[in-house]
Amino acid sequence: MASSVMSSAAVATRGNGAQASMVAPFTGLKSAASFPVSRKQNLDITSIASNGGRVRCMQVWPPINMKKYETLSYLPDLSDEQLLKEVEYLLKNGWVPCLEFETEHGFVYRENNKSPGYYDGRYWTMWKLPMFGCTDATQVLAEVEEAKKAYPQAWIRIIGFDNVRQVQCISFIAYKPEGY
């Protein structure tokens, strides 16, 4: 019993060369008061609420004569250079490029079902076969040009298909007919 009782002063005063490099055991979290506070301590509730006086809010999509095609369809049409970069990104990720076209409705619409979350126009006609093994973005753009010649009044989109996960990873409009 006497050997298990020991004075903490005796342990602390004993100096040894090996103990000098030892790390002190974890003693818990330190008080938050020792850390510098960089945020403003304002408990006034009126300062939290704001109508965004200096912030310009984003407007909603105008519903009249503005058709929605894809997720980012509010952006301007892609130039040939931007289209080439998108296809290079698609190929760099190992996705299989595939072209689809739609001659009647290139936009979201409801005809067969009125429930929320459902819309027609999701499935387009495939242009030829998926381009398995394609490594050159200019080949994909050459197919887009060929599809434009065959169907000048059609919407054409490029999708990137991951054949390992069996999912579509990217989709964007490559061509819209005149007037859209």
UniProtKB/Swiss-Prot annotation:
Keyword Ligase: no
Residue span of the annotated presequence: 1-56
One BP annotation, GO: photorespiration
Note: The basic functional RuBisCO is composed of a large chain homodimer in a 'head-to-tail' conformation. In form I RuBisCO this homodimer is arranged in a barrel-like tetramer with the small subunits forming a tetrameric 'cap' on each end of the 'barrel'.
Task of the protein: RuBisCO catalyzes two reactions: the carboxylation of D-ribulose 1,5-bisphosphate, the primary event in carbon dioxide fixation, as well as the oxidative fragmentation of the pentose substrate. Both reactions occur simultaneously and in competition at the same active site. Although the small subunit is not catalytic it is essential for maximal activity.
Protein name according to UniProt: Ribulose bisphosphate carboxylase small subunit, chloroplastic 3
Family affiliation: Belongs to the RuBisCO small chain family.
GO MF annotation: an example: ribulose-bisphosphate carboxylase activity
Gene name of the record: RBCS3
SMART domains for this protein: RuBisCO_small
Stored Gene3D superfamilies: Ribulose bisphosphate carboxylase, small subunit
Subcellular location field: Plastid, Chloroplast
Subunit and interaction comment: Heterohexadecamer of 8 large and 8 small subunits.
UniProt keywords, alphabetically: Calvin cycle, Carbon dioxide fixation, Chloroplast, Photorespiration, Photosynthesis, Plastid, Transit peptide
Lineage: Eukaryota, Viridiplantae, Streptophyta, Embryophyta, Tracheophyta
Coiled coil: none
CDD domains documented for this protein: RuBisCO_small
Pfam families found in the cross-reference section: RbcS, RuBisCO_small
Assigned GO CC terms: chloroplast
